[in-house]
């Protein structure tokens, strides 16, 4: 259960960071 919560928080942090960068600048990576 502890690892699940850790992964959930980590994923949420990464998603927030990704969306912040994505909305700040036009996507330049990949596609």
UniProtKB/Swiss-Prot annotation:
Membrane topology: Single-pass membrane protein
Record localization: Cellular thylakoid membrane
CC terms in the record's Gene Ontology section: photosystem II reaction center; plasma membrane-derived thylakoid membrane
Primary subcellular site in the record, as a coarse category: membrane
GO biological process, alphabetically ordered: photosynthesis
Keyword Repeat: no
UniProt superkingdom: Bacteria
UniProt keyword list: Membrane, Photosynthesis, Photosystem II, Thylakoid, Transmembrane, Transmembrane helix
Xref: Pfam families: PsbT (PF01405)
Transmembrane segments: 3-23
Family: Belongs to the PsbT family.
Subunit-level organization: PSII is composed of 1 copy each of membrane proteins PsbA, PsbB, PsbC, PsbD, PsbE, PsbF, PsbH, PsbI, PsbJ, PsbK, PsbL, PsbM, PsbT, PsbX, PsbY, PsbZ, Psb30/Ycf12, peripheral proteins PsbO, CyanoQ (PsbQ), PsbU, PsbV and a large number of cofactors. It forms dimeric complexes.
Functional summary from the UniProt entry: Found at the monomer-monomer interface of the photosystem II (PS II) dimer, plays a role in assembly and dimerization of PSII. PSII is a light-driven water plastoquinone oxidoreductase, using light energy to abstract electrons from H(2)O, generating a proton gradient subsequently used for ATP formation.
HAMAP family: PSII_PsbT
Protein name: Photosystem II reaction center protein T
Organism name: Synechococcus sp. (strain CC9311)
């Amino acid at each position: 259960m502890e690892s699940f919560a850790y992964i959930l928080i980590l994923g949420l942090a990464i998603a927030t960071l990704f969306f912040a960068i994505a909305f700040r600048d036009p996507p330049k990576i990949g596609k």
